[in-house]
Each structure stands twice: as structure tokens, then as C-alpha cells.
């Protein structure tokens, strides 16, 4: 009987121990899971609230968030510390100036930190608080209801990947505000894409990182330099293009093209560049024959630099041109004063004193005393006294007496430019070339001529062509034969001329 009782007590003890152990095992398996869920929820709540505390600076906020990540079990304590610090840093002056009572301030603060309101909703509630502070409690109640109704479901809450992506994107230094906000919004919209969004954000951040070589790549530097030297941009336009280059160096080529287009569009028109006086001076200086290229270029540059002194510059250029003009030996222009007939017997402006009519010395019409042949009063054709060759006084070709303005005495003419004339047309009409006319007249540009301008034109006529024509025009007298002309008609003409001169002297 005693043994049976001992066995029963032992059996009861084993049973109690088994039940106790089972209870402990069951309790130990459930408690950690529940605790983990609670910690996660507390961490998320603390994370949201810390992010939206307006009086924390970036370093403080990042420190609290890092603490939440390191030990989620301390979320409540971390949140408490953050709230204390946030409250202690709240601006006092603003609260006093805005005359917000305690209810209004509390509602204002809570609404600012409601994570599920969008910006329009948040701003609407805040405006209602400002409009009627006495309704602060009611406004706050409505805001809380809306915030809770828009709260993400438990399965859509921010998981660890999303939180990590959110934190990293916030601290990427090369993203601008618009880019950063875009990635954060994408994280909120679809947390399942957190890894992909973080990867994209990192790529963009790296691509926008400043380069080690002065931040500007080659294209950007080139565009920067060219835009600085575009003369027709104003300061505002130039600064705008430069700022755009800094903001996005990848668009350097496009920005430079736009700047060039604008510069060309604003370039002064040709007819506005030079005023009338400047154009006239420019043209005249180009055609001053005695200036060197260096002198001509100097005057033209001065005209460009200051069009307002065009008259003075032109006057100086003319003075220098006149001073450098070649001196004339006989102070006459050959072939002009004698109507292009060289070799008159008086060797000085032949034909001018007697109104260009040969034979005037005896007061009669030319050629009457010598068988109706003009110029017979001296027994020879003009220029015969120097061995029958007109213009031979100096043993040179006709018209060469003073070495100036070639071609005046040898059949060359002066062409006065008419409206519509071109150098090529003048050259064709006179049997010469445009280059020859340009060279004879020292034209800087053979296309730059103006109406009224006189051009020396080489007509390509042999020097003795006129004499040959005259000789052929008198075949019946035999004057084309030098011997007959000298012995017979020459003698008679000399005798008759001498008699007439003697008679005229007696009359005088």
C-alpha cells in the first residue's frame, strides 16, 4: 500500500512537470514573433515622425534614423528623444507673432506630421486652422480621420529595402530637388521596386558627379568660351546661356547652337552698320591711287572704329594721297590740253591757246593757205619738225614726255563711268581687259566704281595708227611718201608759211 502511494505521487509530479514544460515551450515560441511585429511597427511609426519633425536639422534627423535602424527595439525611446529635441528647437517668435493658441499650435504640428496626407490636403487643413483657430480641435479630428483612411495597408508598409532606398536617395549629393522628390514618390507608389529605383538613382547621381578636371568637359569649355565672345548677345542672354551650361553640361552643343542663332539674328544689318558719310569715305579711300596698302587699311580701320569722324579721316587720307602723288616734269597732262594730238610745234599745251584749231596763227581757217590741209602752215603734219614722227621730241613713244598717266597721248582715252557700267563692260567696249583697266587706274577692287568716275582706258591702238590713216587719206598728193613730202610740199608750205607770218608781223 505504501509503495502504491509513492508511485502515484511520483507519477503526478511527472505530469505536472510535463504540463509546465509544455506551457513554457508554447509561451517561448509565440512571444518573440509578437515582439518582432511590435518592434517593426514602432520603428516605422518613429521613422515617419522623425522625418517630419520640422525643427530638426539634417544631421540630427539622420542620426535618429540611423539609431532606429541599428536597434528597432529602442524605437519608442529614440522617438521620445527626437520629440524633445524638436520641441526645444521650435521657434518661439513665430508662435507669438502668429497669435496661435495652444489648441491651434498642437493641431498645426500634428497635421504637419501626418504621413498619409498629400500636399493639397495638408495645406487645406493648415489654411482652415489659420482662418478660424477656434475650430482647431474639429479640424484636427477631420485631418486624423483622413490620414487614417489613407494609411497604407499593413502589407504595403515600408519594408527594409524601401527604408534603405529612401535614406540613401535623401543623401545623394548630386541629385537636384526635383529628381530626389521624383524617386521618393516612386518609392511610395511601389515599394516593391525599391531596389530598381535605388539603382537608377545611384546611376543618375554618379553621372551628375562633378568631374575632377574642373567640372567642365571639353564641349562645355568650348561652348562657354564661344558664348562669352558672341558680340551681339546682351548680358542677360549671355548669362542665361552660361547658367544653362553649368546646369546641364550634356547639352553644351545644343546650347551653343541656340546662342549662335540668337547672335546671328541680332547682328546689325549691313545698311545699318555704316552711315552715309562713312560709306562715302570708305569708297573714296579705296580709290585713292597714291596710298599704300598699309595706309589704306589704317584709314579703313579708323572708319570702322569711329564712323562719327568719317569726314576728318577722309580729309586726312586725301591730304596724304596728294602729298604722295608723283610730280609732273612739265606740270601738264600729256594729250589732254591738245585734244590728244602730240607733237605740236610749240611743245606747250598745243591747240588750247588757239581754241584747238591748227593754223590759227595767221588768223585764218585751218588748211586754207596750204591747199585745204589742216596744219599746213608749218609745211608738215603735226610733229614733222622732229623727223616726221609725232611726239618724238624726247626720242620716246608719243605721250611719254612727263611719265604720268600713261596712254593719254598714244590713243588711250578717258571713260566717264555711267550708271550701270561695269569694268568688264568698259573693257569689252574698248578692246582691253578689266584687269588692265584696274591696273592702270590703281583700283583696289575692279568691281568698285561709281558713276562720274573717270577711268583711263587703253584702247589697244598702235601709236602711229592715226598718222597712217592721215597718210592714206592723202594719196593724190603723194604725202604718204616721206621724200616727196619733204622736198616738194614741205618746201612750198614752209615758204608760204614764212610769207604769211611776215605779213602778219607787219600788220601788227
From Swiss-Prot:
Localization of this protein: Secreted, Cell wall; Secreted
Repeat (Immunoglobulin-binding region A) residue spans along the chain: 154-211
Regions of compositional bias (Basic and acidic residues) in chain numbering: 318-412
Immunoglobulin-binding region B repeat residue numbers: 212-269
Residue spans of the Immunoglobulin-binding region E repeats: 37-92
Effect in UniProt of substituting residue 47 to A: Complete loss of binding toepithelial cells
Gene3D superfamilies: Immunoglobulin FC, subunit C (1.20.5.420), LysM domain (3.10.350.10)
Domain LysM span(s) in chain numbering: 413-457
Ranges occupied by Immunoglobulin-binding region D repeats: 93-153
InterPro entries linked to this entry: Ig/albumin-bd_sf, LPXTG_anchor, LysM_dom, LysM_dom_sf, Octapeptide, Protein_A_Ig-bd, YSIRK_signal_dom
Biotech utility: Important immunodiagnostic reagent because of its ability to bind the Fab and Fc fragments of a wide range of mammalian immunoglobulins.
Motif extent (YSIRK-G/S signaling motif): 7-18
Residue stretches of each Immunoglobulin-binding region C repeat: 270-327
Subunit structure: Interacts with host TNFRSF1A; this interaction leads to the stimulation of both surface expression and shedding of TNFRSF1A.
NCBIfam families: LPXTG_anchor, YSIRK_signal
Name of the molecule in the record: Immunoglobulin G-binding protein A
Name of the encoding gene: spa
